[in-house]
Amino acid sequence: VKDGVTVGIGTGEQDRVGVARIAVYKAYTKYANQLAFERHARKYDELVLLAAQGKFDASLIAAIDADTRAARAGLPGSVMISDAFFPFRDGVDVGLKEGVSCVVHPGGSLRDWESIEACNQADPPAAMVFTGQRAFKH
């Protein structure tokens, strides 16, 4: 979440690192889509198709890709939220690598200290909030 907007959601996975990567991927995809629409009034995938057909300048797509990477999809300063605790730091590390500034989760893992340590070691350090309540109920 950033500026009151959900920028990526990873859902329905059993792999905690994989689901964090899915959320990051979605954030990058949505950011590129936003740039494509702002610059060319078309969806990113539509521009890719047009470029493959020789009807759009592929260098303009490369510029969108470069700008998306440079901005890290707008993720720096965002908040990573989980409906269940992080049993290890690896899922948290995925978000921190992209510039997440705060991690919110219920806590309760025997290894919560690893996630706390990850936030403390981030550059800049990230905040961690424990809600004390799981939203994942099945």
Task: Enumerate the predicted regions with their spans.
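Terminal or standalone catalytic/regulatory effector modules within metabolic enzymes
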Residues: 1-6
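Feature captures the catalytic cores and cofactor-binding loops of soluble hydro-lyases/lyases
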Residues: 14-138
